[in-house]
Amino acid sequence: MSVEDQFEGDERALLKRIQELLDVRMKDKRKRYVHSLGVAETALHLAEVYGVDRFDAAAAGLIHDWDKVLSDELVTRALHYGIKIAGSPSAATLLLHGPVAAYELPQLFPELSPAVFQAVDRHTVGACDMTPLDMVVFVADAIEPN
């Protein structure tokens, strides 16, 4: 059963739209696509266990690596948004996909809660004040089975 099949109405439709766009975006990165589906499933399970909003967890899991396919552009985009880059910009590209996506995705998916974008932002390096949703996505990214 896919993630969106576990929801109804507008939530189901939005998750289906996200998954379809993700499929196209990651057409050349199938392992990344399968990983994102796995993170969404794992985040949904963790959300159920820990009492976190299920929809937000599933949505954040799906989009958490949205910009990972843009490694060549991430430093430029990060600088454009004023994201601070510590150390070598080339080394930072592995970590910038979360913060950059958190700036851009609200325009594409305005229906999603700001908490979803914060979880996407924080899934690479965490934060001292992580919310339960942030932690669910952070852990799901590390433990998903794919």
Regions found by a protein language model. Give the residues of each.
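An acidic intrinsically disordered interaction segment
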Residues: 2-8, 105-107
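Divalent metal-dependent catalytic cores for phosphoryl transfer on phosphate-bearing substrates
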Residues: 20-26, 35, 44-146
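Generic N-terminal amphipathic, Lys/Arg-enriched alpha-helix
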Residues: 2-4, 13-28
